[in-house]
């Protein structure tokens, strides 16, 4: 997949990037997303919630260049044409998880089938990363399905050059006849401001509400 180099000297975000990159400023934001219709539609059509959420996340990410901006293995700043999800799958027997990646696809059915094939092949492997090689253009996604939460924060101080979002989903819960799920975003301020965090949340909620257009 193509990695497009950003020439820092000509980038309109240069001042912001250098300031927050040097400070290593990251932040997290958690929002409860209304999945009432989404959950009902997924159940009616026989689709699992987790891969359907992953698909919706990747639709937002791949629509917006800011969420695909990072530093590649050659230490170059730029953005990927497309990201693929790298998601966690829990093993009840070992009480550990694996990370599996699946090729992104704009077509939900194609993505879902690819997800199911990858899950069948790799979910019982006792490795942290069973599907290799892992491409550089992957986005970390995980789910903590045992609890809902109002705040969630990750700290990755051992890798100062990781600029891509990290997304964590919690357990869904009911309130006032609605079903909600917490979604936590971990962002690097060098590339994503509060506006971009809001952009992700609003577009994600929108695609979830319009589930009957794609599922």
Swiss-Prot record:
InterPro entries with a match to the protein in the record: CAT-like_dom_sf, Chloramphenicol_AcTrfase_AS, Cmp_AcTrfase
EC number: 2.3.1.28
Signal peptide feature range: none
Positions annotated as active site in the UniProt record: 189 (proton acceptor)
Record flagged with keyword Lipid biosynthesis: no
Primary enzyme class: transferase
Catalytic activity: chloramphenicol + acetyl-CoA = chloramphenicol 3-acetate + CoA
UniProt keyword annotations, A-Z: Acyltransferase, Antibiotic resistance, Plasmid, Transferase
GO biological process: response to antibiotic
A GO term, aspect molecular function: chloramphenicol O-acetyltransferase activity
A Pfam family it matches: CAT
Database matches in Gene3D superfamilies: Chloramphenicol acetyltransferase-like domain
Subunit structure: Homotrimer.
Role played: This enzyme is an effector of chloramphenicol resistance in bacteria.
Family from the record: Belongs to the chloramphenicol acetyltransferase family.
Name of the protein: Chloramphenicol acetyltransferase
Native organism: Staphylococcus aureus
Gene: cat
